[in-house]
Amino acid sequence: MFEQEMYDVTIIGGGPAGLYSSFYCGLREMKTKLIESQPQLGGKIHVYPEKMIWDIGGVTPISGGQLIKQLVEQALTFNPSIYTDEKVLSIAKNDEGIFVITAESGNIHYSKTVIVAIGGGILNPQKIEIEGAERFEVSNLNYTIKSYEKFKNKAVIISGGGNTAVDWALELMEVASKVYLTYRKDQLSAHEAQITELTNSAIECHYNSEITKLIADDQEGMIKAIALTNHETGTITEIPIDEVVISHGYVRDKELLDNSPLAIERKNDYFIAGTINSESSIPGLYAAGDILHHDGKIHLIAAAFHDALHAVNSAKKYIQPDASDGGIVSSHNDIFKQRNRKLLQESLK
């Protein structure tokens, strides 16, 4: 365990809200640290890196993976301290009003303010409940789709009946040789339009059924077939398969808020109840992105940037009450003067 230097602001969470907060903290000349529990920055967008995102103002359709790349590059503009693979367990406040952030690693971080930007929380996929299944996670048992190329010309089965499962099935139909969908109930829970498209597709659906056995090729360490059990008839169907995709939802880890001794007001036992200015019930602690809840809250990536601006400006005013309410716009901000000259010179080459 080691103790670290003081920061003006510590951002917990490295998704869109946290990354943009990092950039804007730098613009407001705050000493900034960002802590992310996963090994990489980007947040939940890593679940759909090849999905196209259309609803960010001024940004033409962009893949999730490319958006992460650009957000990270922007977040690093002012050289914040970045800690990845660092899970925060609790946030406390000492007698001097300083936030004490304790990580699972034993590290203790100190900060004048905190911005919580953990989105829907640390989300862990619901694993398939078959003994020994985890050994196939390095080969052809998947809990997300990071690249469609992996599934090209392959037989794929998807287990799940929600929006994500059906969406993946429809998209994989374009690249896979055969797509199966299995769901334990008789009706899917996806959107009606998705179900209609699925019904009219070549995807083979098995309802009231679930995967009960993974049949392996022990020499290659891969699944070569699955056994489907129909709960109504008891029929067991064996299907040869190249890739298995499990979409059973996620388990939300709310350990951070539960463990923190601060009386952070919550909504629905998880979300931080706040204001349009991203303030929480704890002075100096702010929230941005999907973790924040208030009556006017919009759950879009674009709205996460808006939350980040409010959170950073509120944090700046908290530690420096005479500071301006907002930062100077980038087009007229001297902080970018040298960078703008460099960009201009490069454009003239």
Curated annotation (Swiss-Prot):
GO molecular function, one term: NADP binding
Catalytic activity: 2 reduced [2Fe-2S]-[ferredoxin] + NADP(+) + H(+) = 2 oxidized [2Fe-2S]-[ferredoxin] + NADPH
Pfam family, one: Pyr_redox_2
UniProt KW Flavoprotein keyword: yes
Domain of life, source organism: Bacteria
Cofactor: FAD
UniProt KW Repeat keyword: no
InterPro entries: FAD/NAD-bd_sf (IPR036188), FAD/NAD-binding_dom (IPR023753), Fd--NADP_Rdtase_type_2 (IPR022890), Ferredoxin-NADP_redctase_2 (IPR050097)
Enzyme class: oxidoreductase
SUPFAM superfamilies assigned to the protein according to its UniProt record, in alphabetical order: FAD/NAD(P)-binding domain (SSF51905)
Enzyme Commission number, as recorded: 1.18.1.2
Record key words, sorted: FAD, Flavoprotein, NADP, Oxidoreductase
Cofactor notes: Binds 1 FAD per subunit.
Positions annotated to bind FAD: E36, K44, Y48, V88, L123, D290, S331
Record note on quaternary structure: Homodimer.
Similarity annotation: Belongs to the ferredoxin--NADP reductase type 2 family.
HAMAP family associated with the record: FENR2
Stated name of the protein: Ferredoxin--NADP reductase 1
